């Protein structure tokens, strides 16, 4: 979908590739995921202090409950993925393929790349998500 929206050539953001798994790093993440039995996935991006938790109509069991927990411990808003932001992300594929929870965590405020001065707050906001991703599911 992003390709059809005009993101058709390599760029610092929003280019999704010419085809699924066309980039070596995408293939590496895919292969790594296929070799493990992950209960959930966390994808980190840097903009907005938001947790995106579902993909289209896919809502794996407990995914909303876990998202709310992550939002509570981080202070981040919990939202559904905007339509134009879906379709090419690791989280989206993971949710659809495995029917397990996946989250995109948007850290920090401002335009990416974020300043290093935000690191301590981002870490403080997210350490509970990282621990919770291991222990609270």
Where are these regions (language model features)?
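Short, flexible loop segments at boundaries between secondary-structure elements
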Residues: 68-82
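Short Gly/Pro-enriched loop/turn and capping motifs at secondary-structure junctions
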Residues: 48-49, 76, 86-92, 109-112
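Structured segments of extracytoplasmic/periplasmic soluble domains
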Residues: 32-36, 69, 73, 129-136
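Extracytoplasmic/secreted proteins, especially bacterial periplasmic and envelope-associated proteins
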Residues: 24, 28-31, 61-69, 85, ...
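His/Asp/Glu-rich mid-to-C-terminal helical/loop segments that flank catalytic regions of hydrolases
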Residues: 114-137
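Short glycine-rich, acidic/polar surface loops and turns
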Residues: 82-102
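Residue-level detector of structured alpha->beta connecting loops
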Residues: 37-38, 75, 99
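Active-site/substrate-binding loop(s) of hydrolase catalytic cores
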Residues: 1-60, 68, 104-114
